[in-house]
């Protein structure tokens, strides 16, 4: 579990990915979702940047609820993502130093759901 009061202690790795997301959902979110689902799972942080020294810092998302609605709409579209393995509890808003960020906890996909791929093309399977 991440300690959001100490966000600056984390760095991107094969289980944590930071995305600024101020202009909406980043296109790369689906590749990250696929990669996490097809491996050991991971956490996507929207409204978080990686600084020059590779630590994390939050940026305030002006309308996180709208981004979450858009996320659910897209992830439930089988033409975009082969399978949605998330539950409601896996996507939520967290406050960090007065900034609102979105946390997306992606579990490891069950064998029956693998591979998880994007854009209705099994060649778009990420690990």
Regions found by a protein language model. Give the residues of each.
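Conserved N-terminal catalytic/coupling substructures associated with nucleotide/phosphate chemistry
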Residues: 1-127
């Amino acid at each position: 579990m991440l300690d959001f009061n100490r966000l600056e202690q984390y760095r991107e790795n094969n289980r944590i990915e930071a995305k600024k997301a101020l202009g909406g959902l980043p296109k790369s979110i689906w590749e990250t979702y696929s990669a996490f689902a097809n491996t050991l799972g991971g956490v996507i942080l929207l409204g978080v940047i990686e600084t020059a020294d590779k630590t994390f810092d939050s940026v305030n998302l002006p309308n996180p609820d709208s981004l979450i609605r858009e996320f659910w709409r897209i992830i439930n579209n089988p033409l975009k993502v082969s399978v949605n393995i998330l539950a409601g509890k896996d996507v939520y808003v967290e406050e960090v130093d007065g900034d609102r960020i979105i946390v997306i906890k992606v579990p490891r996909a069950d064998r029956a759901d693998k591979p998880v791929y994007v854009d209705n093309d099994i060649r778009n399977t990420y690990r």
